[in-house]
Amino acid sequence: MTRIGVFDSGLGGLTVLRELAKTNKSQYFYFGDSLRVPYGGRSEEELRRFSVDIVDFLEKFSIDYYVIACNTLSVTVTDFLREKYKKKFIPITDLALRACEKYQGKFLVLGTETTVNSHFYKKNLEKNPNTTVYEVAASKLVDLIEDDKKDDEKLNEYIDSYIKIAKEKKIENILLACTHYPIIRDKIERRLDYKANIIDPAIFLSESLESASDNLDINIFMSKKTPATENLIPKLIDFPYKLNYLKENL
């Protein structure tokens, strides 16, 4: 059975794992760094250290290849990890670009501060002369999702501020360039006053992998137990899974 490692700064990558599990039966080992979330705004040195901590932990399970289910890590440490471990690492950013290929016109990229400041999506998507990209750092959404305090009023206020430019310019395509954001996709859609293409790269990722296994085995490791991990994991993963919290910090 193929062993696939999937990792993220916290709960967001579970939206990727969920889509993978729907169509690709394999043995999954997911690591969510709920202890050190959010990753947006961290230095590259910190992100390298965090990613090494995670991959070193997952290597104990003889992983065949990895999915970096975090845009922030994808734009900062992908090449570093490939060189260090000599293994296949699939960054969510590459799949996001492929998911955007069938669209053109105006794009709003919602991501963390690190992802937006890298201008990864703007530089790549605007290679198409028919495309214009607007970028908004929506980092506060990650905090609210991970806190899971059900403060819908504050959440709606932040969503409104982040999508204001989309409503003003009637942007046709909104890329969820952080794997946390699909958790509140329905809320984002409701705050828009028009129909837009909401692009979730995780859906495209699941269509891009193949698995010959007949069995699905999901193992989830979180670096810290929080109210959000207790409440959201059962809602995000509707397949049988084994949940483990690390007894010691990384």
Map each language-model feature to its residues.
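Non-catalytic structural scaffold of enzyme domains
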Residues: 1-250
